[in-house]
Amino acid sequence: MKILVYGAGVLGCNLARNLFHAGKDVTLLARGNWAEEIRKNGLRIKDQFSLRTSVSRIPVVTTLAPDAAYDVIFVVLRYTQLDSVLDTLRTNRTKNIVFVGNNVQARALAAALPEKNVLFAFALSAGHREPDRVVSIDLKKITIGQLRGAVSNAELIGEIFGGTKYKVVYELNMEDYLLCHAAFVMPAAFACYKTDGDLKKLRRNTVYLGRVIDANIEGYRAIRNAGHDILPKADADFESEKYRKTCLRFFKLMCATSLGKLCASDHAMNAIDEMSALNRDIKQFFDENGAAYPVWQALEAEAGRYLR
């Protein structure tokens, strides 16, 4: 099975490295100085919480030609970059396309590629890229699947990830999963912008963290009331006191440790365009469905000098 990972940021590099180490025939599409660095010195990934740095001699390309044949292409780009690659994907012969990352317009994106088998995924890794390496935490867990009602891709996913160290969650309704993910991460991004990327400023601010949870609940309520599922299923009881307590513990941990920088503020501060677009599009979803989200709007206003 030939696999292309299209995009060499933190998520793409971790995905390519993990597939490569499992013996998969994987190629990484990178650009500019970063492509040359990988070609010359290998893909270097430093684990944030250990002294270990892996070096992987992964084949690198800089373009996707129409006749380049792969069994699957993982598109690992920012939400704001996806439209720019659609023509390239349309003209390429590969049928199976997996979009990895934030997305609140999954159904529209799949409709834009009617001749393809379009899947979506979200991988649990985070960090930042330096000139000669990636520094990250990689939990080796990926949620992947198609839109509700689409043909099953269980066999394909099993073939891709068989023999890897990934914990794979096969999700039959990735549209709703990604909507819910956006409703969770955007309030956290507002917190990053409020503190100029230093979440430790909020470690004792339980009132503000409570508002972050309130905004998340507003988002989930809007999604549920519009007829969508709350996913993962563990979040279905999002209006319960148990859910609030679990979220508060999580956000306090994020604000008190380096996890906040690595898992939230690094990306939020370096991907303001993506977070702005994600916020814009999920608010459009809220408005189209007549949802009220006053706490969300208040947090957004406090982060306004960053959002575009």
Indicate residue ranges for each PLM-predicted region.
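NAD(P)+-binding Rossmann beta1-loop-alpha1 motif at the extreme N-terminus of oxidoreductases
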Residues: 1-51
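Hydrophobic anchor at the start of a short beta-strand
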Residues: 3, 25-26, 97, 118, ...
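N-terminal glycine-rich dinucleotide-binding loop that anchors FAD/FMN and/or NAD(P) in oxidoreductases
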Residues: 43-60, 185
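Rossmann-like NAD(P)(H) cofactor-binding subdomain of soluble oxidoreductases
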Residues: 52-135
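Rossmann-fold dinucleotide-binding core
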Residues: 105-183, 187
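Helix-loop-beta segment of a Rossmann-like dinucleotide-binding subdomain
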Residues: 133-143, 193-203, 258-269
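Active-site-proximal catalytic alpha-helix in oxidoreductases
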Residues: 175-203, 207-220
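NAD(P)-dependent Rossmann-like dehydrogenase/reductase catalytic/cofactor-binding core
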Residues: 217-220, 224-308
